[in-house]
Protein backbone atom coordinates (compact mmCIF):
# COMPACT_ATOMS: atom_id res chain seq x y z
CA UNK A 1 0.00 0.00 0.00
CA UNK A 2 1.50 3.36 -1.05
CA UNK A 3 2.32 6.08 1.39
CA UNK A 4 -0.43 8.79 1.54
CA UNK A 5 2.05 11.63 1.10
CA UNK A 6 3.45 9.97 -2.02
CA UNK A 7 -0.02 9.55 -3.46
CA UNK A 8 -0.83 13.20 -2.73
CA UNK A 9 2.39 14.32 -4.39
CA UNK A 10 1.63 12.20 -7.46
CA UNK A 11 -1.91 13.57 -7.64
CA UNK A 12 -0.61 17.12 -7.30
CA UNK A 13 1.89 16.62 -10.10
CA UNK A 14 -0.78 15.05 -12.28
CA UNK A 15 -3.14 17.97 -11.70
CA UNK A 16 -0.41 20.45 -12.60
CA UNK A 17 0.43 18.54 -15.77
CA UNK A 18 -3.22 18.53 -16.86
CA UNK A 19 -3.58 22.24 -16.02
CA UNK A 20 -0.42 23.14 -17.95
CA UNK A 21 -1.53 21.01 -20.89
CA UNK A 22 -4.91 22.75 -20.94
CA UNK A 23 -3.19 26.15 -20.83
CA UNK A 24 -0.96 25.20 -23.77
CA UNK A 25 -3.90 24.09 -25.87
CA UNK A 26 -5.91 27.14 -24.85
CA UNK A 27 -3.07 29.46 -25.92
CA UNK A 28 -2.82 27.94 -29.38
CA UNK A 29 -6.56 27.69 -29.94
CA UNK A 30 -7.16 31.19 -28.59
CA UNK A 31 -4.67 32.56 -31.12
CA UNK A 32 -6.25 30.47 -33.89
CA UNK A 33 -9.74 31.76 -33.02
CA UNK A 34 -8.57 35.36 -32.56
CA UNK A 35 -7.03 35.65 -36.05
CA UNK A 36 -10.27 35.16 -38.07
CA UNK A 37 -12.26 37.20 -35.53
CA UNK A 38 -9.89 40.15 -36.02
CA UNK A 39 -10.19 39.75 -39.79
CA UNK A 40 -13.99 39.71 -39.68
CA UNK A 41 -14.20 42.61 -37.24
CA UNK A 42 -11.34 44.93 -38.23
CA UNK A 43 -10.04 43.68 -41.57
CA UNK A 44 -6.28 43.23 -41.81
CA UNK A 45 -4.66 45.61 -39.30
CA UNK A 46 -0.89 45.83 -39.23
CA UNK A 47 1.28 45.77 -36.13
CA UNK A 48 1.71 49.53 -36.56
CA UNK A 49 -2.05 50.06 -36.45
CA UNK A 50 -2.41 48.05 -33.25
CA UNK A 51 0.50 49.81 -31.54
CA UNK A 52 -0.74 53.19 -32.75
CA UNK A 53 -4.17 52.74 -31.21
CA UNK A 54 -2.66 51.51 -27.95
CA UNK A 55 -0.77 54.81 -27.71
CA UNK A 56 -3.43 57.21 -28.96
CA UNK A 57 -6.77 55.72 -27.87
CA UNK A 58 -6.76 57.59 -24.54
CA UNK A 59 -9.69 55.54 -23.27
CA UNK A 60 -12.21 56.75 -25.82
CA UNK A 61 -12.34 53.32 -27.43
CA UNK A 62 -14.01 52.00 -24.29
CA UNK A 63 -17.16 53.85 -25.30
CA UNK A 64 -17.47 51.65 -28.38
CA UNK A 65 -15.83 48.45 -27.09
CA UNK A 66 -19.04 46.95 -25.75
CA UNK A 67 -20.30 46.35 -29.27
CA UNK A 68 -17.40 43.95 -29.89
CA UNK A 69 -17.39 42.20 -26.50
CA UNK A 70 -20.25 39.79 -27.16
CA UNK A 71 -18.79 38.37 -30.36
CA UNK A 72 -15.32 38.17 -28.80
CA UNK A 73 -16.59 36.27 -25.76
CA UNK A 74 -18.44 33.71 -27.88
CA UNK A 75 -16.33 33.39 -31.02
CA UNK A 76 -12.91 33.61 -29.39
CA UNK A 77 -12.85 33.08 -25.64
CA UNK A 78 -15.64 30.52 -25.24
CA UNK A 79 -14.68 28.68 -28.42
CA UNK A 80 -11.05 28.44 -27.29
CA UNK A 81 -12.06 27.17 -23.83
CA UNK A 82 -14.33 24.46 -25.26
CA UNK A 83 -11.83 23.35 -27.89
CA UNK A 84 -8.99 23.34 -25.34
CA UNK A 85 -11.06 21.06 -23.12
CA UNK A 86 -11.72 18.70 -26.03
CA UNK A 87 -8.05 18.75 -27.06
CA UNK A 88 -6.93 18.02 -23.49
CA UNK A 89 -9.32 15.07 -23.26
CA UNK A 90 -8.15 13.74 -26.62
CA UNK A 91 -4.55 14.11 -25.46
CA UNK A 92 -5.30 12.01 -22.36
CA UNK A 93 -6.91 9.29 -24.50
CA UNK A 94 -3.90 9.19 -26.81
CA UNK A 95 -1.50 9.19 -23.88
CA UNK A 96 -3.22 6.28 -22.14
CA UNK A 97 -3.58 4.20 -25.29
CA UNK A 98 -1.13 1.60 -26.43
CA UNK A 99 1.15 1.89 -29.39
CA UNK A 100 4.07 4.05 -30.41
CA UNK A 101 2.02 6.21 -32.77
CA UNK A 102 -0.35 7.22 -29.99
CA UNK A 103 2.49 8.28 -27.71
CA UNK A 104 4.14 10.27 -30.48
CA UNK A 105 0.83 11.81 -31.44
CA UNK A 106 0.22 12.93 -27.87
CA UNK A 107 3.66 14.54 -27.69
CA UNK A 108 3.33 16.26 -31.09
CA UNK A 109 -0.16 17.67 -30.61
CA UNK A 110 0.58 20.57 -28.18
CA UNK A 111 3.43 22.18 -30.18
CA UNK A 112 1.44 21.75 -33.40
CA UNK A 113 -1.60 23.50 -31.94
CA UNK A 114 0.42 26.34 -30.38
CA UNK A 115 2.66 26.78 -33.41
CA UNK A 116 -0.24 26.74 -35.83
CA UNK A 117 -2.36 29.15 -33.81
CA UNK A 118 0.42 31.66 -33.25
CA UNK A 119 1.42 31.48 -36.92
CA UNK A 120 -2.16 32.27 -37.95
CA UNK A 121 -2.22 35.26 -35.60
CA UNK A 122 1.16 36.58 -36.74
CA UNK A 123 0.11 36.27 -40.38
CA UNK A 124 -3.10 38.16 -39.63
CA UNK A 125 -1.01 41.12 -38.43
CA UNK A 126 1.56 40.77 -41.24
CA UNK A 127 4.25 40.22 -38.62
CA UNK A 128 6.63 38.38 -40.94
CA UNK A 129 6.45 41.13 -43.56
CA UNK A 130 6.93 43.69 -40.80
CA UNK A 131 10.15 42.00 -39.67
CA UNK A 132 11.55 41.52 -43.17
CA UNK A 133 10.80 45.10 -44.20
CA UNK A 134 13.34 46.54 -41.79
CA UNK A 135 16.09 45.29 -44.09
CA UNK A 136 14.79 47.03 -47.22
CA UNK A 137 15.84 50.38 -48.68
CA UNK A 138 14.05 53.59 -47.73
CA UNK A 139 11.67 53.91 -50.67
CA UNK A 140 9.62 56.51 -48.80
CA UNK A 141 12.54 58.96 -48.82
CA UNK A 142 12.90 58.48 -52.58
CA UNK A 143 9.20 59.16 -53.21
CA UNK A 144 8.07 61.81 -50.72
CA UNK A 145 7.81 65.39 -51.98
CA UNK A 146 7.71 67.79 -49.03
CA UNK A 147 4.89 70.31 -49.61
CA UNK A 148 6.84 72.90 -47.61
CA UNK A 149 9.51 72.83 -50.31
CA UNK A 150 7.07 73.30 -53.20
CA UNK A 151 6.14 76.73 -54.58
CA UNK A 152 2.40 76.43 -55.17
CA UNK A 153 0.81 78.30 -58.07
CA UNK A 154 -1.99 80.43 -56.66
CA UNK A 155 -5.26 80.76 -58.56
CA UNK A 156 -8.73 81.96 -57.65
CA UNK A 157 -9.56 80.85 -54.13
CA UNK A 158 -12.58 78.66 -53.57
CA UNK A 159 -14.09 77.50 -50.32
CA UNK A 160 -14.03 73.79 -49.57
CA UNK A 161 -16.65 71.58 -47.95
CA UNK A 162 -15.08 68.18 -47.37
CA UNK A 163 -17.27 65.35 -46.04
CA UNK A 164 -15.71 62.06 -44.97
CA UNK A 165 -18.40 59.38 -44.85
CA UNK A 166 -17.57 56.48 -42.57
CA UNK A 167 -16.77 53.30 -44.54
CA UNK A 168 -18.68 54.36 -47.66
CA UNK A 169 -17.77 52.44 -50.80
CA UNK A 170 -19.19 52.13 -54.29
CA UNK A 171 -20.14 48.50 -53.66
CA UNK A 172 -23.29 49.68 -51.87
CA UNK A 173 -24.63 50.60 -55.32
CA UNK A 174 -24.61 46.96 -56.45
CA UNK A 175 -28.28 46.09 -56.94
CA UNK A 176 -27.46 42.42 -57.43
CA UNK A 177 -26.00 42.31 -53.92
CA UNK A 178 -28.47 44.50 -52.05
CA UNK A 179 -31.63 44.40 -54.13
CA UNK A 180 -31.40 48.16 -54.66
CA UNK A 181 -28.85 50.93 -55.10
CA UNK A 182 -28.33 52.05 -51.50
CA UNK A 183 -26.60 55.19 -52.77
CA UNK A 184 -29.37 56.11 -55.21
CA UNK A 185 -30.14 59.49 -53.55
CA UNK A 186 -26.57 60.62 -54.26
CA UNK A 187 -26.95 59.76 -57.95
CA UNK A 188 -29.58 62.49 -58.35
CA UNK A 189 -27.64 65.53 -57.13
CA UNK A 190 -25.23 66.02 -60.01
CA UNK A 191 -21.49 66.41 -59.69
CA UNK A 192 -18.80 64.09 -60.98
CA UNK A 193 -16.80 61.18 -59.60
CA UNK A 194 -13.36 59.69 -60.10
CA UNK A 195 -13.90 56.39 -61.91
CA UNK A 196 -11.32 54.43 -59.94
CA UNK A 197 -10.60 55.75 -56.45
CA UNK A 198 -9.30 53.26 -53.89
CA UNK A 199 -7.88 53.32 -50.38
CA UNK A 200 -4.11 53.75 -50.29
CA UNK A 201 -1.99 51.06 -48.65
CA UNK A 202 -2.47 51.42 -44.90
CA UNK A 203 -5.28 53.98 -45.22
CA UNK A 204 -8.03 51.52 -44.32
CA UNK A 205 -8.89 53.01 -40.92
CA UNK A 206 -10.24 56.46 -40.21
CA UNK A 207 -7.31 58.43 -38.76
CA UNK A 208 -4.96 56.89 -41.33
CA UNK A 209 -7.39 57.91 -44.08
CA UNK A 210 -7.48 61.49 -42.76
CA UNK A 211 -3.68 61.64 -42.74
CA UNK A 212 -3.42 60.06 -46.19
CA UNK A 213 -5.93 62.41 -47.84
CA UNK A 214 -4.77 65.58 -46.06
CA UNK A 215 -1.01 65.00 -45.85
CA UNK A 216 -0.36 62.58 -48.70
CA UNK A 217 1.44 60.07 -46.47
CA UNK A 218 0.70 56.80 -44.69
CA UNK A 219 0.29 56.63 -40.93
CA UNK A 220 2.32 54.24 -38.86
CA UNK A 221 3.72 53.94 -35.37
CA UNK A 222 6.37 56.31 -34.06
CA UNK A 223 9.13 56.15 -31.44
CA UNK A 224 8.39 57.67 -28.05
CA UNK A 225 11.71 59.48 -27.99
CA UNK A 226 10.81 61.57 -31.06
CA UNK A 227 7.37 62.63 -29.81
CA UNK A 228 7.77 64.87 -26.81
CA UNK A 229 4.51 65.54 -24.96
CA UNK A 230 5.89 68.97 -24.11
CA UNK A 231 6.21 69.93 -27.76
CA UNK A 232 3.85 72.58 -29.07
CA UNK A 233 2.91 70.32 -31.97
CA UNK A 234 2.96 66.59 -31.37
CA UNK A 235 1.10 64.86 -34.20
CA UNK A 236 3.29 64.63 -37.32
CA UNK A 237 4.68 68.04 -36.50
CA UNK A 238 7.22 67.78 -39.32
CA UNK A 239 4.53 67.23 -41.96
CA UNK A 240 2.81 69.96 -43.96
CA UNK A 241 -0.84 69.07 -44.55
CA UNK A 242 -3.98 70.47 -46.12
CA UNK A 243 -5.02 72.45 -43.03
CA UNK A 244 -1.55 73.97 -42.65
CA UNK A 245 -1.46 75.21 -46.23
CA UNK A 246 -5.01 76.53 -46.17
CA UNK A 247 -4.41 78.32 -42.87
CA UNK A 248 -1.30 79.97 -44.31
CA UNK A 249 -3.42 81.10 -47.28
CA UNK A 250 -5.91 82.83 -44.97
CA UNK A 251 -8.55 80.09 -44.69
CA UNK A 252 -10.50 79.23 -41.58
CA UNK A 253 -10.48 75.46 -40.99
CA UNK A 254 -13.49 74.02 -39.16
CA UNK A 255 -13.96 70.34 -38.29
CA UNK A 256 -17.29 68.85 -37.26
CA UNK A 257 -17.46 65.15 -36.40
CA UNK A 258 -19.90 63.07 -34.42
CA UNK A 259 -17.45 60.83 -32.55
CA UNK A 260 -15.04 61.72 -29.70
CA UNK A 261 -12.08 63.80 -30.84
CA UNK A 262 -9.80 61.98 -28.41
CA UNK A 263 -10.14 58.64 -30.16
CA UNK A 264 -7.05 57.65 -32.20
CA UNK A 265 -5.45 61.09 -31.82
CA UNK A 266 -7.89 62.72 -34.24
CA UNK A 267 -8.21 65.87 -32.16
CA UNK A 268 -4.43 66.24 -31.87
CA UNK A 269 -3.99 65.83 -35.61
CA UNK A 270 -6.59 68.49 -36.36
CA UNK A 271 -5.26 70.88 -33.71
CA UNK A 272 -1.69 70.53 -34.91
CA UNK A 273 -2.55 71.02 -38.57
CA UNK A 274 -4.53 74.21 -38.87
CA UNK A 275 -8.04 73.40 -37.64
CA UNK A 276 -8.86 76.22 -35.23
CA UNK A 277 -12.41 75.02 -34.60
CA UNK A 278 -13.04 71.38 -33.74
CA UNK A 279 -16.34 69.75 -32.81
CA UNK A 280 -16.69 66.24 -31.39
CA UNK A 281 -18.92 64.28 -29.04
CA UNK A 282 -18.00 66.08 -25.80
CA UNK A 283 -18.32 69.54 -27.32
CA UNK A 284 -21.71 68.67 -28.82
CA UNK A 285 -23.00 67.50 -25.45
CA UNK A 286 -21.60 70.59 -23.74
CA UNK A 287 -23.41 72.71 -26.35
CA UNK A 288 -26.74 71.10 -25.51
CA UNK A 289 -27.12 68.28 -28.03
CA UNK A 290 -29.88 65.90 -26.96
CA UNK A 291 -28.22 62.79 -25.44
CA UNK A 292 -29.39 59.16 -25.66
CA UNK A 293 -32.48 58.43 -23.59
CA UNK A 294 -34.10 61.83 -24.19
CA UNK A 295 -36.99 62.50 -26.58
CA UNK A 296 -35.77 62.68 -30.19
CA UNK A 297 -32.06 62.24 -29.28
CA UNK A 298 -29.35 63.73 -31.48
CA UNK A 299 -26.65 61.54 -29.92
CA UNK A 300 -26.16 57.78 -30.06
CA UNK A 301 -23.78 55.62 -28.07
CA UNK A 302 -20.70 56.63 -30.05
CA UNK A 303 -21.60 60.20 -30.93
CA UNK A 304 -23.87 62.47 -32.96
CA UNK A 305 -26.12 60.88 -35.57
CA UNK A 306 -25.38 61.87 -39.17
CA UNK A 307 -28.68 63.69 -39.74
CA UNK A 308 -28.09 65.84 -36.64
CA UNK A 309 -24.47 66.49 -37.65
CA UNK A 310 -25.48 67.63 -41.13
CA UNK A 311 -28.19 69.86 -39.66
CA UNK A 312 -25.59 71.58 -37.45
CA UNK A 313 -23.25 71.80 -40.43
CA UNK A 314 -25.87 73.64 -42.49
CA UNK A 315 -26.12 76.31 -39.81
CA UNK A 316 -22.33 76.65 -39.47
CA UNK A 317 -21.90 76.76 -43.24
CA UNK A 318 -24.31 79.68 -43.50
CA UNK A 319 -22.29 81.55 -40.86
CA UNK A 320 -18.95 80.82 -42.50
CA UNK A 321 -20.14 81.91 -45.91
CA UNK A 322 -21.61 85.13 -44.51
CA UNK A 323 -18.32 86.03 -42.80
CA UNK A 324 -16.52 86.33 -46.13
CA UNK A 325 -13.25 84.67 -45.08
CA UNK A 326 -12.19 81.67 -47.20
CA UNK A 327 -13.01 78.50 -45.32
CA UNK A 328 -12.61 74.75 -45.23
CA UNK A 329 -15.49 72.98 -43.51
CA UNK A 330 -14.60 69.32 -42.92
CA UNK A 331 -17.18 66.81 -41.66
CA UNK A 332 -16.81 63.20 -40.52
CA UNK A 333 -19.91 61.02 -40.19
CA UNK A 334 -20.28 57.88 -38.06
CA UNK A 335 -23.64 56.15 -38.58
CA UNK A 336 -22.20 53.57 -41.00
CA UNK A 337 -19.43 52.50 -38.61
CA UNK A 338 -18.99 48.80 -37.88
CA UNK A 339 -20.00 46.48 -36.37
CA UNK A 340 -23.73 47.31 -36.55
CA UNK A 341 -23.94 51.01 -37.37
CA UNK A 342 -26.11 53.62 -35.66
CA UNK A 343 -29.67 54.12 -36.90
CA UNK A 344 -30.97 57.58 -36.13
CA UNK A 345 -34.49 57.67 -34.64
CA UNK A 346 -35.46 59.97 -37.48
CA UNK A 347 -34.45 57.33 -40.02
CA UNK A 348 -36.11 54.27 -38.51
CA UNK A 349 -38.59 52.26 -40.53
CA UNK A 350 -41.22 49.95 -39.07
CA UNK A 351 -40.11 47.26 -41.53
CA UNK A 352 -36.52 47.08 -40.26
CA UNK A 353 -35.95 43.54 -39.02
CA UNK A 354 -32.57 41.97 -38.37
CA UNK A 355 -29.11 43.49 -38.40
CA UNK A 356 -28.58 43.27 -42.18
CA UNK A 357 -31.82 45.02 -43.05
CA UNK A 358 -31.20 47.63 -40.37
CA UNK A 359 -27.71 48.30 -41.71
CA UNK A 360 -29.04 48.73 -45.25
CA UNK A 361 -31.46 51.28 -43.80
CA UNK A 362 -28.55 53.10 -42.15
CA UNK A 363 -26.60 53.32 -45.42
CA UNK A 364 -29.70 54.48 -47.26
CA UNK A 365 -30.49 57.06 -44.60
CA UNK A 366 -26.98 58.53 -44.62
CA UNK A 367 -27.08 58.63 -48.42
CA UNK A 368 -30.41 60.48 -48.36
CA UNK A 369 -29.18 62.95 -45.73
CA UNK A 370 -26.04 63.67 -47.76
CA UNK A 371 -28.13 64.24 -50.89
CA UNK A 372 -30.30 66.67 -48.94
CA UNK A 373 -27.15 68.52 -47.82
CA UNK A 374 -25.90 68.77 -51.42
CA UNK A 375 -29.23 70.23 -52.53
CA UNK A 376 -29.04 72.75 -49.68
CA UNK A 377 -25.58 73.88 -50.78
CA UNK A 378 -26.76 74.24 -54.37
CA UNK A 379 -30.05 75.96 -53.53
CA UNK A 380 -28.32 78.53 -51.32
CA UNK A 381 -26.01 79.49 -54.18
CA UNK A 382 -22.85 78.48 -52.35
CA UNK A 383 -21.42 76.60 -55.33
CA UNK A 384 -20.52 79.92 -56.95
CA UNK A 385 -17.43 80.10 -54.77
CA UNK A 386 -17.45 76.73 -52.97
CA UNK A 387 -16.69 73.14 -53.97
CA UNK A 388 -18.27 70.23 -52.13
CA UNK A 389 -16.38 66.93 -51.95
CA UNK A 390 -17.88 63.77 -50.44
CA UNK A 391 -15.58 60.77 -50.02
CA UNK A 392 -15.65 57.55 -48.07
CA UNK A 393 -12.82 57.47 -45.57
CA UNK A 394 -12.04 53.81 -46.35
CA UNK A 395 -13.77 50.57 -47.43
CA UNK A 396 -16.16 48.98 -44.97
CA UNK A 397 -15.19 46.05 -42.75
CA UNK A 398 -16.85 43.88 -40.14
CA UNK A 399 -20.43 45.08 -40.58
CA UNK A 400 -23.62 43.00 -41.08
CA UNK A 401 -23.20 43.01 -44.88
CA UNK A 402 -19.45 42.33 -44.79
CA UNK A 403 -19.75 38.96 -46.56
CA UNK A 404 -21.52 40.58 -49.51
CA UNK A 405 -18.96 43.38 -49.72
CA UNK A 406 -16.07 40.92 -49.65
CA UNK A 407 -17.55 38.99 -52.55
CA UNK A 408 -16.63 41.93 -54.82
CA UNK A 409 -13.05 41.79 -56.06
CA UNK A 410 -12.59 45.47 -56.94
CA UNK A 411 -13.87 47.56 -54.03
CA UNK A 412 -13.69 51.27 -54.78
CA UNK A 413 -14.19 54.10 -52.32
CA UNK A 414 -17.15 56.41 -52.89
CA UNK A 415 -16.35 59.93 -54.12
CA UNK A 416 -18.41 62.84 -55.42
CA UNK A 417 -17.22 66.30 -56.47
CA UNK A 418 -19.90 68.99 -56.74
CA UNK A 419 -18.89 72.36 -58.15
CA UNK A 420 -15.46 71.18 -59.31
CA UNK A 421 -14.03 71.60 -62.79
CA UNK A 422 -14.31 68.57 -65.11
CA UNK A 423 -11.71 65.85 -64.76
CA UNK A 424 -9.48 64.97 -67.72
CA UNK A 425 -10.95 62.54 -70.24
CA UNK A 426 -8.66 59.77 -69.04
CA UNK A 427 -8.11 59.90 -65.27
CA UNK A 428 -5.66 57.36 -63.95
CA UNK A 429 -6.68 55.20 -60.98
CA UNK A 430 -6.12 57.23 -57.82
CA UNK A 431 -5.60 56.38 -54.15
CA UNK A 432 -6.02 58.27 -50.88
CA UNK A 433 -2.64 60.05 -51.12
CA UNK A 434 -3.75 61.63 -54.41
CA UNK A 435 -6.63 63.37 -52.69
CA UNK A 436 -4.20 65.77 -50.94
CA UNK A 437 -2.99 67.65 -54.07
CA UNK A 438 -6.44 67.21 -55.63
CA UNK A 439 -8.16 69.00 -52.73
CA UNK A 440 -5.57 71.77 -52.75
CA UNK A 441 -6.09 72.30 -56.47
CA UNK A 442 -9.83 72.57 -55.84
CA UNK A 443 -9.16 75.52 -53.53
CA UNK A 444 -7.02 77.24 -56.18
CA UNK A 445 -3.49 76.19 -55.17
CA UNK A 446 -1.66 73.91 -57.59
CA UNK A 447 1.73 72.23 -57.45
CA UNK A 448 3.68 72.80 -60.69
CA UNK A 449 3.53 69.14 -61.69
CA UNK A 450 0.48 68.25 -59.60
CA UNK A 451 2.50 66.21 -57.10
CA UNK A 452 2.65 66.61 -53.30
CA UNK A 453 3.58 64.13 -50.59
CA UNK A 454 3.14 60.70 -52.16
CA UNK A 455 0.17 61.82 -54.26
CA UNK A 456 -0.59 63.38 -57.63
CA UNK A 457 -3.59 65.53 -58.50
CA UNK A 458 -6.55 64.18 -60.44
CA UNK A 459 -5.88 67.01 -62.92
CA UNK A 460 -2.34 65.78 -63.63
CA UNK A 461 -3.14 62.90 -66.01
CA UNK A 462 0.43 62.41 -67.17
CA UNK A 463 1.92 62.18 -63.68
CA UNK A 464 2.74 58.59 -62.77
CA UNK A 465 2.27 57.16 -59.27
CA UNK A 466 5.20 57.51 -56.90
CA UNK A 467 7.59 54.59 -56.43
CA UNK A 468 6.23 54.02 -52.91
CA UNK A 469 2.64 53.76 -54.17
CA UNK A 470 3.69 51.32 -56.88
CA UNK A 471 5.62 49.20 -54.37
CA UNK A 472 4.24 50.05 -50.92
CA UNK A 473 5.88 48.74 -47.78
CA UNK A 474 4.24 49.99 -44.60
CA UNK A 475 6.47 48.05 -42.18
CA UNK A 476 9.59 49.64 -43.68
CA UNK A 477 8.38 53.08 -42.58
CA UNK A 478 9.38 52.26 -39.01
CA UNK A 479 13.01 52.35 -40.15
CA UNK A 480 12.69 55.30 -42.52
CA UNK A 481 14.63 58.32 -41.29
CA UNK A 482 12.65 60.55 -43.65
CA UNK A 483 9.37 59.33 -42.20
CA UNK A 484 10.56 59.63 -38.60
CA UNK A 485 11.41 63.28 -39.25
CA UNK A 486 7.74 63.91 -39.97
CA UNK A 487 7.07 62.99 -36.34
CA UNK A 488 10.11 64.66 -34.83
CA UNK A 489 10.02 67.83 -36.92
CA UNK A 490 13.81 67.67 -37.03
CA UNK A 491 14.98 68.41 -40.58
CA UNK A 492 18.25 66.65 -39.90
Language-model features: where?
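Solvent-exposed soluble domains appended to multi-pass membrane proteins
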Residues: 146-492
Amino acid sequence: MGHPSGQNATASIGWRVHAFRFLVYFTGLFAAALAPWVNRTFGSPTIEQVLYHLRFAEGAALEMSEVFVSTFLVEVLLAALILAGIASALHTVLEQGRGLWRARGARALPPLVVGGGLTMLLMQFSAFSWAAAHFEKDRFAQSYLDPAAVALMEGKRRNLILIYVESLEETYSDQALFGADLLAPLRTVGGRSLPAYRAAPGATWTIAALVATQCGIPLTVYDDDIRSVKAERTFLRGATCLGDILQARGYRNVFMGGAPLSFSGKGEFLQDHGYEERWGKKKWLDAGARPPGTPDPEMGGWGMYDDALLERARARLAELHAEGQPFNLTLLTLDTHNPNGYLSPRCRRDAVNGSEEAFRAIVGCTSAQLARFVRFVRDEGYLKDTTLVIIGDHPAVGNPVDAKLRSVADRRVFNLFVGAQPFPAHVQPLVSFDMFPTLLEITGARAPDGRLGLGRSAWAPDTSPSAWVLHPNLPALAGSAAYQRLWSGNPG
